[in-house]
């Protein structure tokens, strides 16, 4: 699982002291070297640096080409620095997929032990807050109810976190999303990015997994990199793969058990 790659059309571009293309290139190299090969690669939004220009996605796809050459299925969500129409034009297989939610890019990735539900929280390009929306919440509820035989894992870009004042500045309709996933006990985890932070939490037994950014951090000591996810029947194991192998959380493994 990768998040917040923030790729510019210029592969030499630097932001916050980081060459984002170098970070993604290193992550891709590590993922393609995994043995056995992963069943899928998930990228959790903010694929592009700022406005989601066509050239951003051209460079992004060039950097991801080793994954595609290796035959690894690639699945994405969209974040606030993406442009949905430009993304669809760049990634032809995404453009050709069914669109069960009008104007949103959603997908279901099925595996032997769990089903993944990838949401679209892009509201307005290059504006920070995100929104799932009523139609997408209804679609998710229906899709979850139709697939209750396996654990369900939901991925969205924006952080579904309600602050002490009752507001959710990341995902504006966090409460509406939680109203869908919390009562459905076969939903075991909710993954998100956006904050460029690696963090684990729980709400009513639902695991909340904040993925680190591939690109750059906001806090000086925060890790950048990606997360290797191994699913089991009764839970999952997450391993942090830091860009800097000397980082204190590089190689950290967390075992998360499914709620009953």
Segments from the language model and where they lie:
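Active-site glycine-centered loops adjacent to acidic/histidine catalytic or metal-binding residues
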Residues: 4, 45-46, 79-80, 157, ...
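Extended active-site neighborhood of metal-dependent phosphoesterases/phosphodiesterases
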Residues: 53-147, 151, 173-186, 201-212, ...
């Amino acid at each position: 699982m990768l998040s917040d790659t923030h790729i510019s059309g210029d592969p030499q571009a630097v932001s916050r002291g980081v060459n984002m293309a170098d970070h993604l290139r290193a992550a891709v190299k590590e993922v393609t070297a995994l043995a056995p090969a992963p069943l899928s690669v998930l990228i959790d939004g903010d694929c592009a640096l700022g406005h989601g220009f066509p050239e951003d996605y051209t460079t992004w796809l060039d950097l991801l080409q080793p994954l595609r050459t290796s035959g690894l299925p690639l699945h994405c969500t969209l974040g606030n620095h993406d442009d949905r129409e430009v993304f669809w034009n760049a990634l032809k297989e995404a453009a050709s997929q069914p669109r069960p939610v009008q104007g949103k890019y959603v997908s279901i990735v099925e595996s032997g032990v769990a089903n993944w539900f990838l949401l679209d929280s892009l509201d307005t390009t290059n504006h920070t807050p995100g929104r799932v929306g009523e139609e997408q919440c209804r679609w998710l509820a229906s899709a979850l109810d139709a697939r209750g035989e396996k654990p369900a894992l939901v991925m969205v870009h924006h952080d579904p976190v309600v602050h002490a004042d009752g507001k959710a500045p990341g995902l504006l309709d966090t409460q509406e999303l939680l109203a869908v996933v919390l009562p459905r006990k076969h939903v075991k985890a909710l993954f998100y990015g956006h904050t460029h932070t690696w963090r684990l939490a729980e709400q009513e037994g639902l695991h909340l997994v904040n993925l680190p950014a591939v690109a750059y951090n906001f806090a000086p000591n925060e890790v950048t990199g990606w997360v290797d996810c191994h699913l089991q029947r009764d839970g999952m194991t997450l391993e942090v793969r830091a860009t800097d192998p000397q980082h204190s959380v590089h190689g950290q493994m967390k075992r998360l058990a499914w709620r009953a």
